[in-house]
């Protein structure tokens, strides 16, 4: 095989694959197509999740309530023993 070039080896390998794997090629192509559809749907989902996260950070997609929070403010005296350390 000293006289064979790279492109000739590629053609021989492709012919061998077609000869020995011909019955399996439709199933392999179907699986490849299904994998590509799953991959593209996952990429699309990641993009929409990324946009949602960006909206939450910017405040446009905020779900915070407009109602005030109940509680009380506590001011400690300077004489409080818990503040002295």
From Swiss-Prot:
The keyword Transmembrane applies. Signal peptide: none annotated. Pfam families: TatA_B_E (PF02416). One of its GO terms (molecular function) is protein transmembrane transporter activity. Residues 43-85 are annotated as: Disordered. InterPro entries: TatA/B/E, TatA/E. GO terms for biological process: protein transport by the Tat complex. It comes from the Bacteria. The chain crosses the membrane at residues 1-21. Keywords: Cell membrane, Membrane, Protein transport, Translocation, Transmembrane, Transmembrane helix, Transport. It is a single-pass membrane protein. Residues 44-58, 69-85 have a biased composition (Basic and acidic residues). It is found in: Cell membrane. The keyword Nucleus does not apply. One of its GO terms (cellular component) is TAT protein transport complex. Part of the twin-arginine translocation (Tat) system that transports large folded proteins containing a characteristic twin-arginine motif in their signal peptide across membranes. TatA could form the protein-conducting channel of the Tat system. The Tat system comprises two distinct complexes: a TatABC complex, containing multiple copies of TatA, TatB and TatC subunits, and a separate TatA complex, containing only TatA subunits. Substrates initially bind to the TatABC complex, which probably triggers association of the separate TatA complex to form the active translocon. Belongs to the TatA/E family. HAMAP family: TatA_E. This is Sec-independent protein translocase protein TatA. It comes from Micrococcus luteus (strain ATCC 4698 / DSM 20030 / JCM 1464 / CCM 169 / CCUG 5858 / IAM 1056 / NBRC 3333 / NCIMB 9278 / NCTC 2665 / VKM Ac-2230) (Micrococcus lysodeikticus).
């Amino acid at each position: 095989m000293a006289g064979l070039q790279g492109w000739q080896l590629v053609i021989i390998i492709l012919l061998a694959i077609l000869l020995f794997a011909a019955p399996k090629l439709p199933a392999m192509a179907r699986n490849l197509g299904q994998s590509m559809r799953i991959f593209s749907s996952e990429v699309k989902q990641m993009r929409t999740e990324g946009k949602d996260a960006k909206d939450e950070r910017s405040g446009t997609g905020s779900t915070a309530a407009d109602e005030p929070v109940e509680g009380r403010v506590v001011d400690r005296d300077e004489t409080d023993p818990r503040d002295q350390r």
